């Protein structure tokens, strides 16, 4: 048994990894800011100690796992180096862990967390699968056959991994504080493709993914019969989305997903492709797909009277469009109200027009002040720059939250990667309901 200390344990990946090591029988603790972060719930439920930052947290027998958000001068990292302890980055440590399993990396600008959550749930319907999901959820199952994990492209972190398979959901320009342009993003994914050992499953309609070259087979999925695996006869029902799957032009089986939206069918196709390639039992896979309950902060719903309140992590224009599409397909007779908190000044600046276009697909838009990050907490623009580009949009905060009560037959989408849950919970308090998020 090893004693691990995680510097920045409330980070979504760090929280998941800490839970995995705890489940595998190791002693685990960590430190972070004292402000509430939703990822800490799972840590506390497993009895994992969360401490405030302090150099005295570092003890002689520890292996220190360092989060990517903190500089090498951080007091705990500095103490660990002074004591000549093993200090391993999150990426390098995860790379070591996955080598013990048949591993499946899920990467892409959008859809990573939802697809990883679905993959882990469905594969566990047939084979033991440990998993690390970017919503702060992780589980280490002793004697697992597989390891499903989310692999982020930011700062090329995913180049630390050499997975057996990689699901590539899409390539898009994001993280403008690091990537120069879409070509820079493509180069990162191209380099990652050469790390994959058995096969790549990629979305067939992505023009950039179609240009990827690899040393292993690439299987494309989508809605066209030119794809290697594709869905047809898609039907929206009161139970979810039903569809037929074809592999290499031959009918494979009929599936039902309890979710809505084209992107959820695409996620399911990627997972079904992995299951097919690994020859998992299709009956077990179908049953597991039908029971998938979603992941944290991805279209999580709470219903109060005729109003559906949704918590979602969407923080990029394409993700915002996807959540609005899901709301319209699932609740076609309700208004869609978007409450959005932009995440980072650089992203807001880079996608200002795209944010305005995607948010305008809602019936009404409310915007919160821009949420900064540890690396970037100021910028040249303000939230008013985005408000001015969306007809009828207005600013909202905890003091004005009761304005949402007027939309009594609506889906209210709270979206963002910052602390928008404070606003959600303030609204739930106004309605006399215990916090659901």
UniProtKB/Swiss-Prot annotation:
Q: Name one GO biological process term.
A: cell division
Q: Major place of localization?
A: cytoplasm
Q: One Pfam family name from the record?
A: Mur_ligase
Which InterPro entries does the UniProt entry name for this protein? Mur-like_cat_sf, Mur_ligase_C, Mur_ligase_C_dom_sf, Mur_ligase_cen, Mur_ligase_N, MurCDEF_pg_biosynth, UDP-N-AcMur_Ala_ligase_MurC
The EC number of this protein is 6.3.2.8
UniProt function note:
Cell wall formation.
Molecular function (GO) terms for this protein are:
ATP binding; UDP-N-acetylmuramate-L-alanine ligase activity
Query: What keywords would UniProt list here?
Result: ATP-binding, Cell cycle, Cell division, Cell shape, Cell wall biogenesis/degradation, Cytoplasm, Ligase, Nucleotide-binding, Peptidoglycan synthesis
Subcellular location(s) per record: Cytoplasm
UniProt name for this protein:
UDP-N-acetylmuramate--L-alanine ligase
Q: Which organism is it from?
A: Staphylococcus aureus
């Amino acid at each position: 048994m090893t004693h691990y200390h995680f510097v920045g344990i409330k980070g979504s990946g760090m929280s998941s990894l800490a839970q995995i090591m705890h489940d595998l029988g190791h002693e685990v603790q960590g430190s972070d800011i004292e402000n509430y972060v939703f990822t800490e719930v799972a840590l506390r439920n497993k009895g994992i100690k969360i401490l405030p930052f302090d150099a005295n947290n570092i003890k002689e027998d520890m292996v220190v796992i360092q989060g990517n958000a903190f500089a090498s001068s951080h007091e705990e990292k500095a103490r660990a180096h002074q004591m000549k302890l093993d200090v391993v980055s999150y990426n390098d440590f995860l790379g070591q862990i996955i080598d013990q399993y048949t591993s499946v990396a899920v990467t892409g600008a959008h859809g990573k967390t939802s697809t990883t959550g679905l993959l882990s749930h469905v594969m566990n319907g047939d084979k033991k699968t440990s998993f690390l999901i970017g919503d702060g959820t992780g589980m280490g199952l002793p004697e697992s056959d597989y390891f499903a994990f989310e692999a982020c492209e930011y700062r090329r972190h995913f180049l630390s991994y050499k997975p057996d398979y990689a699901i590539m959901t899409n390539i898009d320009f994001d993280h403008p504080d690091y990537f120069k342009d879409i070509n820079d993003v493509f180069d990162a994914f191209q380099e990652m493709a050469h790390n994959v050992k058995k096969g790549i499953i990629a979305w067939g309609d992505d023009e950039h993914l179609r240009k990827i070259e690899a040393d292993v087979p690439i299987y494309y999925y989508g809605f066209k019969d030119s794809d290697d695996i594709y869905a047809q006869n898609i039907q929206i029902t009161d139970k979810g989305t039903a569809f037929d799957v074809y592999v290499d032009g031959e009918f494979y089986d009929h599936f039902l997903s309890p979710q809505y939206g084209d992107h959820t069918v695409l996620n399911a196709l990627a997972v079904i492709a992995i299951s097919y390639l690994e020859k998992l039992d299709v009956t077990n896979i179908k049953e597991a797909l039908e029971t998938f309950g979603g992941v944290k902060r991805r279209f999580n719903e709470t219903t109060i009277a005729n109003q559906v309140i949704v918590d979602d992590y969407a923080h990029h224009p394409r993700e915002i469009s996807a959540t609005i599409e899901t709301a319209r397909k699932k609740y076609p007779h309700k208004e869609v109200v978007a409450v959005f908190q932009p995440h980072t000044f650089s992203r807001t600046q880079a996608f200002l027009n795209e944010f305005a276009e995607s948010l305008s697909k809602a019936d009404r838009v409310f915007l919160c002040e821009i949420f900064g990050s540890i690396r970037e907490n100021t910028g040249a623009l303000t939230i008013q720059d985005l408000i001015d580009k969306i007809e009828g949009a207005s600013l909202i905060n905890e003091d004005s939250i009761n304005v949402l009560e007027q939309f009594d037959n609506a889906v209210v989408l709270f979206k963002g990667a910052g602390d928008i849950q404070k606003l959600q919970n303030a609204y739930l308090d106004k309605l006399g309901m215990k916090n659901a998020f």
